[in-house]
């Protein structure tokens, strides 16, 4: 639950960060924020005075006689109040155009067209400090090198058509870029086609990212509690639909650039213009320096010094020249296959497969899903031989009822390579027809228990009738302990440890409490009755040390016997069937001894083992579930792993995991195929385009 909440929180934060990034990026791209500047631009709010001047200028221009002769296709509109004024530093480029017989200038900062009022044009220089305001159409300049439009408001009425179409630069040092020389006639302006747009924009990164985000949200929903499932699934579906919509119906109309269509004479200028015909960067049209695609270089010279039809972007990048050279036709006939989104899909598929593998066992999800698809009836079994003879398969459902023994195969500890025994782990049921195993018995443990009881009785007496009451009270007040059956302790120690090398520390301690020099002599005196009635006084510290020594000595014997019983119980007879819960759930309900809140002593562990063995070595059971695995071990025992039947919601999670896994695998293979195929097509694309142009320009006359 905690992991699920953490994953959900991470995704929510990621979505918030992505949304904020897109929002601020869009703001940066809106209006004048995207205008390039040679120095760091500054920003301020549009004042009321500036807003009024812009409104007066645009209103006067739109209602005056200029609108009849001047193209208003890219004329600015009234900006919104509170718009930002950007102060930047850059070079202004201009070229001439004609519309309905009227010449006019169009101004650009790099590839961005701007509107400069004619009254501010005389103040332009080689590098200019401009105050630019964004409008719904194109930006308008309200200040040039310290001269502002509001200072020229009184001259609005003096504007003439000649000033508008051919502004005079009164400043002799003004050096804006302009297209002089052979005339270039602007025929019309159009929007770029979808094919031209795809060449430099349609990478599919955002579309693929939205689809991957939807799939990852679906993966997250399968790891979340039920309460979050519908909401996260709905969010993931929304991103998927949006991504698919953008792939098949991209919203590109508002993002298309303008294409300027010219007719004019191409010239080769510059340092290499007279002798180096391999240069494609020194060709111009009416003073406009042109930028060509590199693979057009062998074919451009056919149109030099000829009147040619040409289409280009505002940044002077040519996209069509003459009857043959055309990026539109190239993309239409030999499309460039982009595979960025396919790479994103591959990474997303690998991530989903990895998360499914780490978070939920994939084999279990698939087995339970196949079991649900088969919709088989449970196999009712009352005898283990039916399981041995039946043709069972993974995914089948069984219901077993009978009498067996709680048993789980022992695990192997990597630390000490010793079998770890958990008494009667009822997550496994051993089922056969052999006689039930006997309850564990041990005479050694009974002897150890007798010694423990005797020492406990003397060091912590409840009532002692063998000692004078007044003497007992005096001993207690003095902080001493009385051993009034010292010979009994000696005899029971000898009975537990008959060998000379056993219980050496305990034997030495008892010898030190007597007047005898060695253990055999002490035992002989106790057996002869010479120590009968002998009382031994011990200080509290000595009594505590003796008690701990007896506990330690007897514990080693008890644990040894428990290990022997574990080996016996871990060695059931061969054959039969072992039903195991792969969820480690208890298949039999039984009452465990939970009276003590402390760790049980070795003797208590032995008593609990005896109590449970009497119950669970031969216990009735009724269990069932979906078979998730079957194996026959070295003893010939058929081990069947069962998973309890999930409820409808859990089954839905398992089915969702399986379907998402198969989808991710198929998605991975499909996109790997697309990546390889598209790379091969792109490698052959330029060769096919070159063959096409060779055929167009150099085909033999018919």
UniProtKB/Swiss-Prot annotation:
It holds the Pfam family IgaA. The keyword Cell inner membrane applies. The chain crosses the membrane at residues 4-24, 204-224, 227-247, 343-363, 656-676. GO terms for cellular component: plasma membrane. Signal peptide: none annotated. Keywords: Cell inner membrane, Cell membrane, Membrane, Transmembrane, Transmembrane helix. It is a multi-pass membrane protein. InterPro entries: IgaA. The keyword RNA-binding does not apply. It is found in: Cell inner membrane. Up-regulator of flagellar flhDC master operon. Belongs to the IgaA family. This is Flagellar operon control protein UmoB. The lineage of its organism: Bacteria, Pseudomonadati, Pseudomonadota, Gammaproteobacteria, Enterobacterales.
